[in-house]
């Protein structure tokens, strides 16, 4: 019996953490095995991402996904029937071929990725093994260092503060569970500081605290340091700070300037680099994402020349999980790390290939969720399957975030003594030497 062959493919509309529709796909094999994938969605999206297909009609403010679902059920499903689910690369190649566009704009990356995710889960379930083991084999045992949002700003909090994410990374913990406990303590300490200052504690899209009453972006850095200390840790020794600037959101491509609306400042690229460099000198910052715009290659190069040996510089909107854009970054020596988002490229195979390309060229992969998330935990398994070493899924609150952190805790327990946790050693591959504080 060829139980490993695909018997049916079914897509449906479900909802993400921002109450927007998204695509869920079930793939059933001939032996009855089922795999399921739910597609995430971003708020601040790069210009060069694979195209997420939305209906553009009155329902759901134009964000319906009935067209993408129709494409799965009517166009993709018939051509996936009887395929061997064990051959993920062949399935993804067929999905790409059926769409026929370089950015998956005809059928929608959300339609294609849903099928790709469901197929890999069906394959893992067919063999009755965890997804990280199915995709990564016996060598998949490196647990990711968590990058956890404490304050959510930018597009995740109605732009009440310009910087999108203020995060912490545990650097002294010997295990994932101990590292995650540290960031939870910092998160709760930050809430206490907000309450003590009489500020309402609201929650941003990814579970971080809503930055109420800030007069400057730098206040977020000061609050993180205070929170780390209140939790009983030493900033720069036990935990470092990470920032997602998401600078494309406030970049003016015509003038080549950056507008910090909170402070009513307009900065040249040189001034923007100078501001970030000053922050790195004055605070225990060990990672900056999208410090300069996706359209500002010159600015990104200036930032890398200034900070590339001191801290991790992550390209998200700049690279969009796309090997050709990462190749350009490698050739120009821009950044030293790549944010990995499945829906930016659109299939599991392409995502894994991008991670491998990143690692092979001395850059650090950081597997990431989106602001519109669900209970789906594929990215956790993907991070461990590829030994990526870092995971960014939002904060320590909201169940679509904790679902993923909890999945890492379960995998850590399952791996037992074979689990490897790199702690701050994860940054060594990029030749980063952190400042001492």
Swiss-Prot record:
Cofactor stoichiometry and binding remark: Binds a second Mg(2+) ion via substrate during catalysis.
Enzymatic class: lyase
Residues annotated for (2R)-2-phosphoglycerate binding in this entry: 164, 341, 370-371, 392
Any GO CC annotation of this UniProt entry: extracellular region
CDD domains the UniProt entry points to: enolase
Protein's cellular compartments: Cytoplasm; Secreted; Cell surface
Gene3D superfamilies registered for this protein in UniProt: Enolase-like C-terminal domain, Enolase-like, N-terminal domain
Annotated family: Belongs to the enolase family.
Protein name: Enolase 1
Organism from which the protein derives: Desulfitobacterium hafniense (strain Y51)
Lineage per the UniProt record: Bacteria, Bacillati, Bacillota, Clostridia, Eubacteriales
